[in-house]
From Swiss-Prot:
Keyword Oxidoreductase: yes
Protein name: FAD-dependent monooxygenase elcH
Residue numbers binding FAD: 59, 73
Enzyme nomenclature, EC number: 1.-.-.-
Pathway(s) it belongs to: Secondary metabolite biosynthesis
EC top class named in words: oxidoreductase
Biological source species: Phaeosphaeria nodorum (strain SN15 / ATCC MYA-4574 / FGSC 10173) (Glume blotch fungus)
Keyword Disulfide bond: no
Keywords: FAD, Flavoprotein, Glycoprotein, Monooxygenase, Oxidoreductase, Signal
Cofactor(s) essential for the protein: FAD
Entry's Gene Ontology molecular function annotations: monooxygenase activity
Annotated glycan sites: 126, 147, 157
Signal peptide: 1-19
Physiological role: FAD-dependent monooxygenase; part of the gene cluster that mediates the biosynthesis of elsinochrome C, a perelyenequinone phytotoxin structurally similar to cercosporin. The first step of elsinochrome C biosynthesis is performed by the polyketide synthase elcA which catalyzes the formation of nor-toralactone.
Length: 485
């Protein structure tokens, strides 16, 4: 039993859905990419040349290739992910220029096993056929990612200020307004504007507890030391620039690294703290006294506290991360990269996750020809990427805990550390990115099939109701009367 009012509502709903589907099927889908940086540029590379898509790329920066990183450090999975984007992306590292970071020697920094080598990465079998860390200059790499995207589609100096979600009957479901007053209509928005940007709150809501980054309870001091000074303070064993290695000292609650990099010995010291750090402060002041207290537990021969006290500018950087997000999508708006899962320096695996996000989104959106396809693509993206990126986040965090001797039943025992680090390496390399990509495609196809089946049922029902249009017209004035179908 239906009232004429309910039938009319159903008819309007069906007409709206049909109009919406037709409006997106009859034209290119407008894909807005916002934020700039590694994930955004890689997604632009993945989508370029797709005849079904009109890609528009917006970067808040004046330069389309800016980054807060002086260098990118890519783990082996980055090479695999880029190869799955397309052939051009697969060769981008070679064309950009790169060099391998010196392989690590992990050493116990204190206690009865002090100076015992835990793991020498150079002695391990390279099962990935890529360096432990590939170092790339961000600017030429991002240029490679944006290469081939028409300049008319690239929009620097565009800061997003609002997103208006339109009625389903609208030609475009999204209206993006920028700080300069310009407006872009779009079918879907994919954004990565960093851990403190707007995209995360657009997806989760401004008041969601997982919206803002959180302090990981580690602070780090960074020092760039002239090689001669580093050699005097660290000694020949650790400070000799000709060794071609980087050294990591594991302490109880502290960790110290030194490596010869671009003409300087770069030294990094991190320590655990339970202080209530104010994340509105991007750095905080430290003192010789504090650094000495934090790092004097390490072998005195290292002189790590003297290096950090004398060359760090007495500034500490908080290690921050995102709490797990319950979703990466909200309607036709999705977040990726550092907006979705910012990871600390300890985790080291953030760049690979940014590129994996773009690889999956690019694969899915390339095959989208309607708004319904886009919705299915975003659903598949969220389904596969959230568990994967969160696993990587926790996996990388475990490495940080191992570095600082804070894993229960491992501590700073050299044999236990070696076993745990080898297991960490094995787990990192075991993930199959091709299978990950195929699973995303499978989920998208299945979602489209299920939703199109439901749509056909509604369409048939509407056809039946359409036959009674004359009856509706005859009984317009009796809107409260029941009509039995």
């Amino acid at each position: 039993m239906f009232t004429l009012r309910s039938l009319a509502i159903l008819a309007v709903f069906a007409a709206t859905a049909l109009a919406s589907k037709q409006s997106s099927n009859d034209r290119e889908l407008v894909v807005a990419i916002y934020g700039g940086g590694l994930a955004s540029a890689t997604l632009a590379q993945a989508l370029k040349g797709s005849s079904n898509l009109n890609v528009q790329y917006f970067d808040p920066a004046l330069d389309l290739t800016p980054t807060s990183f002086r260098l990118f450090g890519f783990d082996p999975k980055v090479h695999d992910a880029l190869a799955l984007v397309n052939e051009e992306a697969g060769g981008a590292i070679e064309r950009s220029g790169w060099y391998p970071e010196e392989p690590s020697v992990v050493v116990v920094g204190q206690g009865s096993d002090a100076d015992t080598v835990v793991l020498d990465w150079a002695q391990l079998k390279n099962t990935t056929h890529h360096p432990q860390v590939t170092v790339v200059d961000p600017k030429p790499f991002l240029q490679q990612m944006l290469n081939g995207t028409d300049e008319s589609r690239l929009h620097p100096n565009k800061t997003l200020v609002s997103i208006t979600r339109k009625d389903l009957s609208a030609k475009y479901p999204l209206e993006l307004k920028f700080q300069d007053g310009s407006i872009q209509h779009a079918d879907v928005l994919i954004g990565d504007d960093g851990p403190f940007g707007q995209m995360r709150s657009e997806v989760l809501g401004a008041k969601h507890p997982a919206n803002a980054p959180v302090f990981m309870n580690f602070l780090s001091a960074v020092a760039h030391v002239a090689p001669d000074d580093a050699e005097k303070l660290l000694g020949q064993k650790y400070g000799n620039r000709d060794l071609g290695r980087r050294f990591e000292r594991v302490g109880m609650g502290s960790w110290f690294l030194n490596a010869y990099l671009e003409g300087f010995s770069t030294c990094l010291g991190s320590f655990y703290t339970e202080e209530a750090y104010d994340l509105s402060q991007f750095t905080r002041t430290t003192s010789v006294k504090e650094l000495t207290a934090r790092f004097s537990n390490l072998n005195e021969a290292d002189n790590s506290q003297k290096i950090l006290s004398g060359y760090s500018g007495l500034r500490l950087i908080p290690e921050i991360e995102h709490s797990p997000a319950p979703t990466y999508i909200n309607g036709l708006v999705a977040m990726q990269g550092n907006a979705a899962h910012f990871m600390t320096n300890f985790q080291q695996l953030g760049p690979s996750q940014q590129i994996e996000d773009a690889m999956i989104l690019g694969t899915l959106l390339r095959s989208a020809h309607s708004r319904a396809d886009v919705e299915a693509a975003l659903y598949a993206y969220d389904t596969v990427r959230r568990p994967r990126s969160q696993w990587v986040s926790e996996h990388g965090k475990r490495l940080g805990w191992l570095w600082t001797g804070m894993v229960e039943d491992v501590g700073i025992d050299a044999k236990k550390l070696k076993k745990a680090m080898l297991q960490w390496k094995q787990d990192s390399e075991a993930f199959d990115l091709k299978a990950h990509k195929n699973e995303a495609v499978k989920i998208m196809k299945q979602t489209i099939k299920e939703r199109s089946g439901s749509e056909k049922i509604i369409t048939q029902e509407e056809k039946i109701k359409a036959g009674f249009q004359g009856l509706w017209e005859a009984m317009r004035e009796k809107s409260g009367e029941q009509v039995e179908l």
